[in-house]
Amino acid sequence: MRIQIEKDQLGWVAGLLDSCGNIMFSKTHVSGNIEIKLKLTDYECLENMKTKYGGAVKVSRTGTRYRLNHSEGLKKLLEDINGQIRIPVRVKKVKEVCEKNNIEIKYPDKELSLDTAWLSGFFDGVGSIVINQTTLENKKQLVLTFNQKNNQILIKIQRIVGGNFYINTNTQSGKYKYALYFTSKEEILQLYEYFKKYPSRAYKNKRIGLIPQYYELQTLMTSIHDNQLQETLWKKFMIQWDYKEIDEIQSGEILKQKGVIR
């Protein structure tokens, strides 16, 4: 379903570009070329970008790519995100492309805020929401995560919404990857309230919408002592939750029928 990007949601565009966007220059596109890559299931999400700014959406079996390089749409997008880009490497690139398009660069406030849609767009690019099966009392743990190669922006996110850090080190390259993750019910519900105001536009929004139902089911389980009934209730819930394999296959089939991929 196509959802119009309203003025108060423009921070989402900046957050998405910060998380998984790329700004390039070439001989054929001297004014700049913006590219954003998402999963196959997020085809409609990038079609929303195309509707607002023009450009093109290309789908392959591995994902969906949005590319914008025509002058009018590029300038409109730059005006919308100007002053909201936060990742240093992106700020540098936006400064370059603004200069080439005669746009005065603006810089964001030092501290992040929950009063913009930036965090929603950033989550759509690098976030995940899963239920992990733990060995402790066979518990099913809801986990919401932001992943990044650099921890600077994650520290700023932690200041406003909490969470805990996990550092993954690649033993071969010695490089670090950082994850800011949330398991606390209070913190996750705070994020849920934020997403109600500034919705995720990626397919993972389906899971975000199920957060209250997850906690209701967790509470219900404490009063049910029939293991078979518990298993039945969880299976029914997980049919709604586990869209990944089923819906990625279905999305692929639908896009084939539309002639988007072959």
UniProtKB/Swiss-Prot annotation:
Query: What keywords sit in the KW lines?
Result: Endonuclease, Hydrolase, Intron homing, Mitochondrion, Nuclease
Biological source species: Dictyostelium discoideum
Q: Which Pfam families match?
A: LAGLIDADG_1
Reported EC number(s) for this entry are 3.1.-.-
Cell compartment(s), UniProt: Mitochondrion
Please give the GO cellular component terms listed in this UniProt entry.
mitochondrion
According to the entry, what is the taxonomic lineage of the organism? Answer: Eukaryota, Amoebozoa, Evosea, Eumycetozoa, Dictyostelia
- Matches recorded under Gene3D superfamilies: Homing endonucleases
Please give the name of this protein: Intron-encoded DNA endonuclease ai2b
Q: Name one GO molecular function term.
A: DNA endonuclease activity
Q: What does this protein do?
A: Mitochondrial DNA endonuclease involved in intron homing.
Which SUPFAM superfamilies does the entry link to? Homing endonucleases (SSF55608)
Gene Ontology biological-process entries: intron homing
EC class of the enzyme, as a word:
hydrolase
Family note: Belongs to the LAGLIDADG endonuclease family.
Q: Does the keyword NAD apply?
A: no
